[in-house]
Amino acid sequence: MPKEGITPRAQDYSQWYLDIVQQADLADYAEVVKGCIVFKPTGYALWEAIQRGLDDRIKATGHVNAYFPLLIPKSFLMKEAEHVEGFAPEVAEVTRAGGEDLAEPYVIRPTSETIIGYFYSKWVRSYRDLPLLINQWANVMRWEMRTRPFLRTTEFLWQEGHTVHATEEDAERETLLILHEVYADFVEKDMAIPVIRGLKSEKEKFPGALRSYCIEAMMQDGRALQAGTSHNLGQNFARAFDITYTDQHNTIQYAWTTSWGVSTRLIGALIMTHSDDEGLVIPPRLAPTQVVVVPIYRNDAERSVVMEAVQRMTAEWKGLLRFKVDDRDNLTPGFKFNEWELKGVPIRVEIGPKDIEKGSVAIARRDQPGREGKSFVPQEGLTARLAALLEEIQQALYRRALAFRETHTADVTTYEELKQQVERGFARCYWAGTMEDEKRIQEETRATIRCIPLDQPQQAGRCIYTGKETTQQVIFARAY
């Protein structure tokens, strides 16, 4: 039975998603600011967990954090033609300040390649200054016409890395390092979301990039979500902003740059990959609260005994598990069970007077709602048992998501088969079409090339649209 207030996925997937966001208390609509949301404490705690996991990996690969201005001179955006064309419709401008018209308008940061490129041109002088590896955590504004909480909002939070290198090979190595060792590693291991690592098509690549790499995930409605991108910018931005260095032979060279980013849409990916009709489901490694304890008692005397047992039990957990004891006296145990299930806490521990007598507790797994996920276990050795169960849940969520993707991905050999397959999931096919061909397919099916998988077949096949022989396969899907 679906939770009250949550539309079943099978009935209306889009409304189900919005219901989860609101019922799990993740966000509120900022009606007074078009397309923006308020991150409520529960939603922001998820973003903090995402930040920690990514920030550790970003720093482990040799990068450092910095912060650059929110306002960017409009002239900076105009310096890279392909870049400005790609972002112009989404840009918000500041034209007045201090009661006066500005001599030059500012744009509110849609992304930071241009202003960071300006500063890099001042900081980089010699090959000894390279590589320059900087990341920033920031907010971004893009004037979206159709918004949806976390997935597409006018203002969103993200990290964006910007690096400078002496050679194209170094820049390419950096781009793939971020894709594999930071983004894919985090999303698969911490978020339990399987991803396809690939290259963007010319139509879908980042404006101004030489090559764009991505990780693509499948949501429970079969649609794709781009979970992260890593761009080799070539020398385009280096030439636009004069980022040069003197090499070992005392010759001035243009540098090679990269940029890469993920955003709060990862929260949307988490919701749509793992959650169910009972509410939010959070993978244990990412969960702000991994275990919630619900003490059960009927009077003050029982309360005293139970709470003493809870304190002894949880004393062992400190530093090992992220836990919360729900000792609110004004709510029934049933209400608490429902609330924590709705909020996606991976494990619920129930303990009452009878459990204390038996030396046991009841454990309920969030990934298995109802009787299937409930069991009684001894209090002795509980800490180790909970830690093992959290890891078991983490792996189970990943396997379930991977199995779903595999059963909703199919190889297609004709355009008609592609049209049918994108109704239910990913269509994998041989492709030798043009950008115009891809645009026509999007107009007819609402599907795009999500990526050209890095894992390509050895044998050749025929393009589903042109009939030409090719060894390149792509993934077509509808996307968020």
UniProtKB/Swiss-Prot annotation:
GO annotation terms (biological process): prolyl-tRNA aminoacylation
Domain of life of the source: Bacteria
A GO term from the CC aspect: aminoacyl-tRNA synthetase multienzyme complex
Keywords, sorted A to Z: Aminoacyl-tRNA synthetase, ATP-binding, Cytoplasm, Ligase, Nucleotide-binding, Protein biosynthesis
UniProt-listed PROSITE patterns: AA_TRNA_LIGASE_II
Catalytic reaction annotation: tRNA(Pro) + L-proline + ATP = L-prolyl-tRNA(Pro) + AMP + diphosphate
MF GO annotations: ATP binding; proline-tRNA ligase activity
Chief place of localization: cytoplasm
SMART domains: ProRS-C_1
Enzyme class: ligase
EC number: 6.1.1.15
Disulfide bridges in this chain: none
Compartment(s) of residence: Cytoplasm
Similarity-based family: Belongs to the class-II aminoacyl-tRNA synthetase family. ProS type 3 subfamily.
Domain free text: Consists of three domains: the N-terminal catalytic domain, the anticodon-binding domain and the C-terminal extension.
NCBIfam families for this protein: proS_fam_I (TIGR00408)
Assembly behavior: Homodimer.
Function: Catalyzes the attachment of proline to tRNA(Pro) in a two-step reaction: proline is first activated by ATP to form Pro-AMP and then transferred to the acceptor end of tRNA(Pro).
Protein name in the entry: Proline--tRNA ligase
